């Protein structure tokens, strides 16, 4: 079996601190470091106009890189229908952007209750937060399912598969992610598996999601993690992915405090070694 292809998220070069690192610069660095592709973080982009998008696509192509993932944020867990509609509209726009960039998959999130406002505090609490008073998780799941169902026709039209990530909120666990994916039951909504977002029973939960994954995000923490560090056995992750017959891209999300100039190449070396076959 061929080695898995390895890309890098532009998030690896910018952890939401200071001015966003230019996407074009990230593409150039990815090529220099020897990656196969690039996953673009939407919040890091310098614009959405077509000239900007096509320049990024041209740049990646001339560097021999695939633009293989588009990482976006959603917040469907709200009793306010207007808030949910705003997030639906945002997702539809992001599907269009991915299509214009030639990117085949879009990372989507469930959103969360937002009863803990600070992300740092949320991470200190292991991603767990109280429900909004007067509401139950069942209602939150219904909002997410109803919202993502409205995005399926656009995803199908554009040929962009949404990948629901295990990314806090009601998608914090494999059970929560699969509750949504199974309910919608569409080939245009699958899973983005993040190896660093399961803080309990990580390998068992990865096994649950791996057969449904269209993209895997691989966390590393050289220099210590920005919020926490996990000891992830990537030989074991590789076996999970192989057993699930996963053949897609693995996207590095370097989340360590070490400078990206050294932390990212170190991470690539680990992934090249462990995911070789």
Please annotate each region the language model reported.
Residues 54, 59-66, 78-190:
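Active-site acidic/histidine proton-transfer and metal-coordination neighborhood
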Residues 44-45, 74, 112-113, 169-170, ...:
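Conserved beta-strand edge residues that scaffold enzyme active sites
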Residues 36-45:
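A short beta-strand-loop structural module common to alpha/beta enzyme folds
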Residues 1-34, 102-105, 145, 149, ...:
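Histidine-acidic metal/acid-base catalytic patches
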Residues 20-24, 44-53, 85-86:
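Aromatic- and glycine-enriched glycan-recognition loops and surfaces
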Residues 39, 69-71, 107, 163, ...:
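Conserved beta-strand positions in the central sheet of alpha/beta enzyme cores
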Residues 75-80, 114-117, 200, 222-226:
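A short acidic, helix-capping loop that chelates divalent metal ions and anchors anionic groups
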């Amino acid at each position: 079996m061929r080695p898995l292809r390895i890309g890098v998220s532009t998030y690896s070069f910018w952890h939401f601190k200071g001015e966003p690192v230019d996407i074009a610069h990230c593409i150039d660095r990815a090529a220099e470091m020897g990656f196969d592709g690039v996953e673009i973080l939407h919040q890091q982009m310098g614009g959405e106009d077509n000239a900007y998008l096509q320049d990024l696509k041209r740049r990646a192509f001339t560097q021999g890189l695939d633009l293989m993932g588009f990482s976006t944020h959603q917040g469907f867990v709200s009793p306010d229908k207007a808030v949910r509609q705003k997030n639906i509209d945002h997702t539809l726009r992001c599907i269009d952007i991915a299509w214009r960039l030639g990117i085949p998959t879009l990372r989507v999130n469930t959103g969360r209750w937002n009863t803990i406002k600070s992300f740092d505090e949320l991470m200190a609490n292991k991603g767990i937060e109280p429900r909004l008073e007067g509401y139950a998780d069942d209602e939150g799941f219904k909002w997410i399912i109803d919202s993502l169902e409205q995005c399926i026709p656009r995803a199908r039209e554009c040929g962009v598969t949404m990948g629901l990530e295990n990314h806090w909120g009601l998608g914090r666990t494999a059970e929560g992610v699969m509750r949504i994916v199974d309910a919608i039951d569409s080939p245009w909504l699958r899973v983005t598996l993040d190896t660093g977002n399961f803080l309990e029973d990580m390998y068992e939960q990865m096994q649950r999601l791996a057969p449904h994954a269209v993209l895997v995000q691989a966390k590393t923490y050289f220099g210590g993690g920005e919020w926490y560090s996990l000891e992830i056995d990537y030989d074991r992750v590789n076996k999970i992915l192989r057993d699930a017959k996963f053949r897609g891209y693995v996207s590095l999300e370097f989340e360590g405090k070490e400078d990206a100039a050294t932390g990212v190449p170190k991470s690539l070396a680990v992934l090249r070694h462990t995911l070789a076959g």
